[in-house]
Amino acid sequence: MTSTALNTAGYQQQLDEKAERIQNIFEDFETPELEVFASPAEHYRMRAEFRMWHEGEDLYYVMFNQETREKYRVDQFPAASRLINDLMPLLVEALKPSQTLRHKLFQVDFLSTLSGEILVSLLYHRQLDEEWEVEIKKLKQCLNDEGFNLNIIGRARKMKIVADRDYVIEKLNVFDQTLTYKQVENSFTQPNGEVAQKMLEWAVDCTQDSDGDLLELYCGNGNFSLALAKNFERVLATELAKPSVESAQYNIAVNNIDNVQIVRMSAEDFTDAMAGKREFRRLKAQNVDLQSYNCNTIFVDPPRSGMDEGTCRMVQGYERIMYISCNPDTLKENLEILSQTHKITRFALFDQFPYTHHMEAGVLLERK
């Protein structure tokens, strides 16, 4: 059995094992009953990437065994969305006859959406020319005539050619609200669309009786900011990655949300700004007056490394802390500080990555 095969019959068992494992990790903390949010058992990943293998006239997708590093052919990938699986064979068959499009092609990346859009990135070990552009536009039109809503990117060293967009538009349903998100190629997006919707609904439910303003660190493309905006008077959100900030600004505008402001700076710099250690010109340039905000709640979704101690101490200054974590081990380390002043009142497991050891957790903490 290759790693492309899924044991869908064993899905619930692996989820139960994760739930037990995460409860064991946090057994030293007083936690409420664990809320468990399942994933679809297959076709849950909204993105996938494959190496391309050239064998005579043949061309096909391959993956590599993580332990032996041996390659194996992949014609279908049940973990990926149905949209990706539908496109995979048609794309490779369209590439095969064209020497221009297949020459030194070494990788294909897919980014799909629940809304029906899909973006394909073709990576090459050669520079791309006008002939490639002509051919790729023909291929794109051919596949869109088959019913796809497809855009394509060609990449080579220090080179990027876009036909016609380098992003997809996703639509996520959060209770009775439909939110629109711009998701840019090579920027972080939640990999599991169905579970992402459940995470947003959980966050909205946790904060439905809020007052005052919300501060959010590590906001990405505004994924949570937009969903939570209706529960607060204002939202002030920080993000360091420039493409994510640009997407967040687009998402705020397209959803007609007028109470969210995004500031491009790191969580560590923002901590210094909040403490008054130094002034930041970018805050002044964006007319952000930190003293005007009345933030009782803070939302954090840090990278796998978690928050540093200084950020944890800053976060402790808020009445309520909502923490989404992709690494329970660093969440545990942070909770050893946060639990000195706050108690855990909600505790959730989101199965973003079925059949792997990875676990996504959510906790709501309230001041003791």
Swiss-Prot record:
GO terms for molecular function: rRNA binding; tRNA (uracil(54)-C5)-methyltransferase activity, S-adenosyl methionine-dependent; tRNA binding. One of its GO terms (biological process) is tRNA methylation. S-adenosyl-L-methionine binds at residues 190, 218, 223, 239, 301. The active site is at 326 (nucleophile), 360 (proton acceptor). Keywords: Methyltransferase, S-adenosyl-L-methionine, Transferase, tRNA processing. InterPro entries: MeTrfase_TrmA_AS (IPR030390), MeTrfase_TrmA_CS (IPR030391), SAM-dependent_MTases_sf (IPR029063), TrmA_MeTrfase (IPR011869), U5_MeTrfase_fam (IPR010280). Its EC number is 2.1.1.-, 2.1.1.35. SUPFAM superfamilies: S-adenosyl-L-methionine-dependent methyltransferases. Signal peptide: none annotated. It is an enzyme of class 2 (transferase). GO terms for cellular component: cytosol. It holds the Pfam family tRNA_U5-meth_tr. It catalyses: uridine(54) in tRNA + S-adenosyl-L-methionine = 5-methyluridine(54) in tRNA + S-adenosyl-L-homocysteine + H(+); uridine(341) in tmRNA + S-adenosyl-L-methionine = 5-methyluridine(341) in tmRNA + S-adenosyl-L-homocysteine + H(+). Dual-specificity methyltransferase that catalyzes the formation of 5-methyluridine at position 54 (m5U54) in all tRNAs, and that of position 341 (m5U341) in tmRNA (transfer-mRNA). Belongs to the class I-like SAM-binding methyltransferase superfamily. RNA M5U methyltransferase family. TrmA subfamily. This is tRNA/tmRNA (uracil-C(5))-methyltransferase. It comes from Photobacterium profundum (strain SS9). The gene is trmA.
